[in-house]
Amino acid sequence: MTMPIIMIIGVVFFLLIALIAVFITKYRTAGPDEALIVTGSYLGNKNVHVDEGGNRIKIVRGGGTFVLPVFQQAEPLSLLSSKLDVSTPEVYTEQGVPVMADGTAIIKIGGSIGEIATAAEQFLGKSKDDREQEAREVLEGHLRSILGSMTVEEIYKNREKFSQEVQRVASQDLAKMGLVIVSFTIKDVRDKNGYLESLGKPRIAQVKRDADIATAEADKETRIKRAEADKDAKKSELERATEIAEAEKINQLKMAEFRREQDTAKANADQAYDLETARARQQVTEQEMQVKIIERQKQIELEEKEILRRERQYDSEVKKKADADRYSVEQSAAAEKAKQLAEADAKKYSIEAMAKAEAEKVRIDGLAKAEAEKAKGETEAEVIRLKGLAEAEAKEKIAAAFEQYGQAAIFDMIVKMLPEYAKQAAAPLSNIDKITVVDTGGSGESSGANKVTSYATNLMSSLQESLKASSGIDVKEMLENFSGKGNVKQSINELTNEIKEAKTIQKSE
């Protein structure tokens, strides 16, 4: 009993598997780009198309259906569009002008149940190329018919209308085939006789003329705009350059004013510094001069003390003739030396003062010129004053020496003066470059050579007479008095009295 049950279960299972396999193999689906055409019995009523003859077909789109084995069959029908290139040979237009046309058409099977059923009736079982060839022949035929009903000008000027007319006429025949025209365009219309080219020449010329005019106008406007832009740019540049120049001028004026103020302040400071320096140096110079004046005064006092000391020494030794003579000579020499020292010191001091004043003048020349001139004037005045004092002191000492030593001092001075006097008297002889002596044969002093040498001795012998005649000084008499031929004792007494009187006068002063 178990075996029959197992067999029954096995048969049922097998049948179930077989049914599932049959269902899987017979269930058909349609994609979005196709339609499933089901024919046969037991089609039902959904998506079923019935034609005028009562024939029924089931059309499935975007879904699926079970195809009954033995009773039904299914075939897919592509709904994809097709591109058709259509062209015509030479076709005579309404005017009898032969033209050719090329176009492009996009066709597909319609989307309604009736259009799909019509297309299935026409093309089911045919290839895609067969379907496209049939549609192309229909389009080319209608394209030729439309070309023959229009003029060349209408075709050339209104291609849109030409395309629409071809599409309108061809759509009626293609609809009977279940096809629709998605788009139709005319790519080219041409002829072999140059008719279309001739039609375009006037327009081309007009267009070129208009283009040239427009180009010329555009160029003119461009040049005008460019000229205006250049003018505005140059104007802006000039204004900018003017502003920059004005700003630079203002800046330079400010800089010049600033430099002028700086230079003025610096000049004032330098002038003030130079003036202060000049005043300080002037004060230092004045102090140095005061110190030198004091030193000179001290030196004069020392010299006066030395003179007094020598006078005392002379007083102690005046009774001796030899000592008196020697003392007289020494005092004369001392007086002369004191005179020379005084003159040398005065000149040295004068030179130093003038050099310092000149250096001070050069250093503060310029801005402190007035102060330098003032300092120079004061310095020169001081030099003149000191020089006058020195000369006065020297003359005073000479006068004092004359008062003290009398004729001895005068004699000493004359003796020292005689060589210079003789030199100046014989100076004309030194200017003689050459002497030619002509000897006539005489002898003795009258001969030529002796006579020339006697000129000099005669000149020296006549020197005393010329000195006495010009100055009143008798050198011969002074020598006799000084050597003792005169009244020497009286002279000594007179000299002693003169010295005492000079001392009394100096003490009273």
Swiss-Prot record:
Induction pattern: Transcription starts during stationary phase. Few foci are seen in exponential phase cells; the number of foci increases as cells enter stationary phase (at protein level). Few foci are seen on rich media, when cells are grown in minimal medium more foci are seen (at protein level). Expressed at low levels in rich media during exponential growth, more highly expressed in stationary phase on sporulation/biofilm-inducing media, activated by spo0A probably via AbrB (at protein level). Surfactin induces expression via spo0A.
GO CC annotation: membrane raft; plasma membrane
Compartments, record wording: Cell membrane; Membrane raft
Motif EA repeat 4, residue range(s) on this chain: 390-394
GO-annotated molecular function: protease binding
GO biological process, one term: protein localization to plasma membrane
Cytoplasmic side stretches: 1-3, 25-509
Loss of function: phenotype: Delay in sporulation onset, 65% reduction in sporulation efficiency. No effect on KinC activity, a double floT-floA deletion decreases the number of proteins in the DRM, blocks the ability of KinC to stimulate biofilm formation. Single floT deletion has defective motility, loss of NfeD2 localization, no change in FloA localization. Double floA-floT mutants have marked defects in cell morphology, motility, and transformation efficiency. Double floA-floT deletion makes no biofilm, has greatly reduced FtsH, sporulates less than either single mutant.
Chain segments carrying region Required for correct localization: 203-509
Residue ranges annotated as motif EA repeat 2: 357-360
SUPFAM superfamilies xref list: Band 7/SPFH domain
Residue ranges annotated as motif EA repeat 3: 370-373
InterPro entries reported in the protein's UniProt record: Band_7, Band_7/SPFH_dom_sf, Flotillin_C, Flotillin_fam
Positions of region (PHB domain): 119-301
Intramembrane segments: 4-24
Motif EA repeat 1: where in chain: 342-344
Principal localisation: membrane
Keywords linked to the UniProt accession: Cell membrane, Cell shape, Membrane, Repeat
Signal sequence, renumbered to the chain: none
Region annotation (Not required for correct localization) ranges: 485-509
Subunit structure: Homooligomerizes. Oligomerizes in very large complexes in vitro. Interacts with FloA, FtsH, FtsX, OppA, SdhA and SecY in detergent-resistant membrane (DRM) fractions. Interacts with FtsH at midcell. Interacts with FloA. Interacts in vivo with KinC, FloA, FtsH and ResE. Interacts with ResE, colocalizes with ResE in FloT-only membrane rafts. Another study shows nearly complete colocalization with NfeD2, but only minor colocalization with FtsH or KinC.
Comment text on domains: A hairpin loop (about residues 4-24) tethers the protein in the inner membrane. The isolated PHB domain (also called SPFH) oligomerizes, but does not bind lipids. The C-terminal 24 residues are not required for correct localization, but the last 300 residues are required. The C-terminus determines the oligomerization state of the protein; there are few large foci for FloT. Swapping with the C-terminus of FloA leads to many smaller foci.
Function description: Found in functional membrane microdomains (FMM) that may be equivalent to eukaryotic membrane rafts. FMMs are highly dynamic and increase in number as cells age. FloA and FloT function is partially redundant; double deletions have marked synthetic phenotypes. Flotillins are thought to be important factors in membrane fluidity, especially during periods of rapid growth in rich media.
Record family assignment: Belongs to the band 7/mec-2 family. Flotillin subfamily.
Name the UniProt record assigns to this protein: Flotillin-like protein FloT
